[in-house]
Amino acid sequence: MPALRAVLFDLDGTLLDTAPDMVGALNKLLAEQQRVPLPYHEVRNLVSHGSSRLVKLGFPEVEPEVFASLQKRYLEIYAGALSLETRLFEGMDGVLKAIEGRGLRSGIVTNKPGWLTQPLLEQLGLTARFACVVSGDTVSARKPDAMPMLHAAALAGVPAEACLYVGDAERDVQAAHAAGMPALVATYGYLQPGEDWQAWGGDGSIAQPIDLLPWLERSGRA
């Protein structure tokens, strides 16, 4: 692996613990529709799959046109409560400081749309900490396509092969490898029970953010 020059992160379930607010928005939508809220633990592990999967969980039987309306309402609710409980995962602030201290760049590549990603980062005071932010609508393709990964590397000013990507879904590994980047699986993220993440072919895994530190030392800039 070439000398590491940048670390790129998935957003939901890797960099940020967004589940409390995303689950909260779903339960508010359910309440509006006179339905029983879902237990947090039943919803958390689907958060990485986005609003469509969450609304489908809450309303599995509705017709497509009704579903589209419910998803629109869900996004309205969530957009108004992006950062009530969302925070960096424990230890991630120290990891970002370690990346900065080694003279490496950091960035975000997420399938979350920019109209949600940018306000969320701004509300948490994180925008300036990243050399690049590529959202789900920044380029014409999303993960697992390589395009957003390559775009992030270009924005960060480093070759793709000098980037390390960290994510909690199979599409993260697929996108990174398609772009020529090594990928780590964040097993602390929103994996579903029994999900065989080892079959994704990642280059390693981290059970907590601080487990990323030894990988930074391999950059040769420790």
Set out the residue ranges of the language-model regions.
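Generic C-terminal helix-cap and adjacent flexible tail
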Residues: 2, 102, 210-222
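N-terminal helical cap/lid subdomain that shapes the substrate entry/recognition surface
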Residues: 2-94, 100-102, 113-115
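Conserved SAM-binding loop
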Residues: 15, 88, 106-109, 141, ...
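A structural signal for hydrophobic residues in beta-strands of small regulatory alpha/beta folds
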Residues: 15, 134, 185, 205-206
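Substrate-recognition/cap helix-loop segment adjacent to the acidic, metal-dependent catalytic center
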Residues: 31-33, 37, 54-61, 85, ...
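Short secondary-structure boundary segments
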Residues: 111, 137, 169, 187-190, ...
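Structural recognition of alpha->loop->beta junctions
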Residues: 126-133, 196-214
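Acidic, Mg2+-coordinating phosphoryl-transfer loop and its flanking beta/alpha structural elements
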Residues: 164-204
